[in-house]
Amino acid sequence: HGTHKPAGLNRTYPNVLNFEGVNGLEQMKWSSPSVDQVKYDVMIPFIRQVSGPMDYTQGAMRNASKGNYYPCYSEPMSQGTRCRQLALYVVFESPFNMLCDTPSNYMREPESTAFIAEIPTVWDESIVLDGKMGEYIVTARRKGDVWYVGGITDWSARDIEVDCSFLGDKSYHATLFKDGVNAHRAGRDYKCESFPIK
């Protein structure tokens, strides 16, 4: 915990799972609205994460769109959307993930909570599919025969076409969490849909 520099100790001592060493989501309890956590989040995969796994403490269920965030120690919120919080579990490497919100908030959000509970924390394969530091990143990670794809962006809305050639010739069933039509006003707005991929 804290700002200890990751120095490769997890290679020498495999029982060391991850280090914080990051301006994680807990900072949103007291950070001024001038802090741009969303921009920070699309930079650290290219900088901090290169040196190893990190404890960011993602998973906020109270999500504020741009301009609606304010620091609140007793009921903290994230900047950005709910789907962004879910995608961070794929984009950020963290073998020992923490949950940043309260149990009652997770109980009120069973669909998001179920996704967080099911996502692996160690991976068999990881591929960065697309990205530009400070703007966006899309990462695919595989555990067994199951692939997870997560993408985050800065405050700019964008559509990204994902090249699914990494799936090979197999057929898959996809579950997609995506920002809802009102996510730019209410960060908690999202839609979950399922469809086949061939």
Annotate the PLM regions:
Residues 1-77:
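Aromatic- and carboxylate-enriched substrate-binding clefts and catalytic-loop regions
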Residues 1-3, 21, 58, 102-103, ...:
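Active-site proximal loops enriched in glycine and acidic residues that flank catalytic Cys/His/Asp
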Residues 65-92, 97-98, 142-147, 152-158:
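Long hydrophobic segments that form regular secondary structure
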Residues 83-129:
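Catalytic cores of secreted or luminal carbohydrate-active enzymes
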Residues 106-112, 155-158, 165-173, 177-183:
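Active/binding-pocket-proximal capping segment
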Residues 133-172:
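Carbohydrate-binding surface patches
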Residues 176-197:
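Solvent-exposed beta-strand/loop surfaces of large extracellular or lumenal domains
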